Amino acid sequence: MATPVKLQFAAPKRGMPPVHMADLDEETLKERVQELGLPKFRADQIRRQYYGRLQGDPMEMTDLPESKRAAVKEALFPELMQPMRNMDADDGETRKTLWRLHDGTMLESVLMRYPGRATLCISSQAGCGMACPFCATGQGGLDRNLSVGEMVEQARAAASTMQEEGGRLSNIVFMGMGEPLANYKRVVETIRKVSAPAPDGFGISQRNITVSTVGLAPAIRKLADEEMKVRLAVSLHTPDDELRDELVPVNNRWSVEEVLDAARYYADTSGRRVSIEYALIRDMNDQPWRADLLGKKLRGALGTKVHVNLIPLNPTPGSKWDASPKDRQDEFVRRVEAQGVPCTVRDTKGQEIAAACGQLAAEER
């Protein structure tokens, strides 16, 4: 019997970052602005600059009194994250950014450009406590949860980059470092902020936001009750409990059946189709019978409200596993679709710079 893997649902007790303007609601921001000796309406100007014009430096907010900009910066705009390194791949279409946070913690985010859209893969935690053995992030353990401000700042930085290029950040996927539903409250607040229209947010449609989870079943149901329109992606990786206990250790807490029941509740409540993420690993979870079982289970649990996203395993340092050969991958797709479940192979970006799914490790190399 395998040795139980220790999971980290609660982040270690570490100091959270200083409060940033993006952490505050409208009324609290007005109070803070008044404490600086400014009238309330200046709070609206700050919000329009930050969310509407993507300006993160009060010293450049020309509609604020010049004599007050330094005070606004000190009180409301602490430097939460500093870019340490950018790495580009896919002929410049993919950029991975390594960030150093205020306490020295490191994290990564990935901006991916596609024809007609730009997607940010955002981190919700520094590290991850779910301990999936094929994922570089999970093997590094959990440092701490990210604040709302730290997540919103990842989005603002990416949106600003796209604006400079004459484009627009259109999609956000919570598929970076961390288990989003283990940082539940802050992730939900971040979603509401980035999806609100300016000057309350960046105006990114909730339908263009995806939240990925390894399967925290109660949190999936709770997310459904938030009545948001974000897409749910469940990292399933195998349809049977025996193997999933090993590949996704949280399965020892919530079984495949419990996770799929929660996913069905989410689909019924939100009206959104659920995405099932499946990293295809050679001789581990790519057998024809597993493809058949996956299709049958998903069809039974979710009916037509499901889509399988097959991910060729991305290499990580020291891993004993590798991706399935293409002929086996194609056969897997065929068998899943034979059960009436749509199945596509993900267009993996950023593999050469360790920016693809499961590769983020925030190492300062």
Swiss-Prot record:
Q: How is the cofactor bound?
A: Binds 1 [4Fe-4S] cluster. The cluster is coordinated with 3 cysteines and an exchangeable S-adenosyl-L-methionine.
Q: Which of this chain's residues are annotated to bind [4Fe-4S] cluster?
A: C128, C132, C135
Cellular compartments per GO CC: cytoplasm
Q: Which cofactor does it need?
A: [4Fe-4S] cluster
Name the CDD domains for this protein: Radical_SAM
Say if the entry is tagged with keyword Disulfide bond.
yes
Q: Which GO terms describe its biological process?
A: rRNA base methylation; tRNA methylation
Record: active site: E108 (proton acceptor), C357 (s-methylcysteine intermediate)
Q: Does the keyword Methyltransferase apply?
A: yes
Reaction catalysed by this chain?
adenosine(2503) in 23S rRNA + 2 reduced [2Fe-2S]-[ferredoxin] + 2 S-adenosyl-L-methionine = 2-methyladenosine(2503) in 23S rRNA + 5'-deoxyadenosine + L-methionine + 2 oxidized [2Fe-2S]-[ferredoxin] + S-adenosyl-L-homocysteine; adenosine(37) in tRNA + 2 reduced [2Fe-2S]-[ferredoxin] + 2 S-adenosyl-L-methionine = 2-methyladenosine(37) in tRNA + 5'-deoxyadenosine + L-methionine + 2 oxidized [2Fe-2S]-[ferredoxin] + S-adenosyl-L-homocysteine
SMART domains the UniProt entry points to = Elp3 (SM00729)
Keywords in alphabetical order, please: 4Fe-4S, Cytoplasm, Disulfide bond, Iron, Iron-sulfur, Metal-binding, Methyltransferase, rRNA processing, S-adenosyl-L-methionine, Transferase, tRNA processing
- How would you classify this enzyme at the top EC level? transferase
Family membership: Belongs to the radical SAM superfamily. RlmN family.
Misc note: Reaction proceeds by a ping-pong mechanism involving intermediate methylation of a conserved cysteine residue.
Name of the protein in question: Probable dual-specificity RNA methyltransferase RlmN
